[in-house]
Amino acid sequence: MGFDTFEEIIRYAIEREKEAVDFYEEASRLEPYAWAKETFEGFAKEEQKHAALLEGFLKGEKSGV
């Protein structure tokens, strides 16, 4: 996989973060133990923050948020 621009790299990273959100949300839905469900939900929220940070980079925001 090759990238020609910084924007392509960031867009790729955003997609991977969104996939991670989906993964952790699905894991949370399937998890019978409350402590593990909460852990997966926390992971999903962190991945959402990462995606927002990267989207901010695309908008030219220095901090990304």
What are these regions (language model features)?
Residues M1-V65:
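Non-heme di-metal
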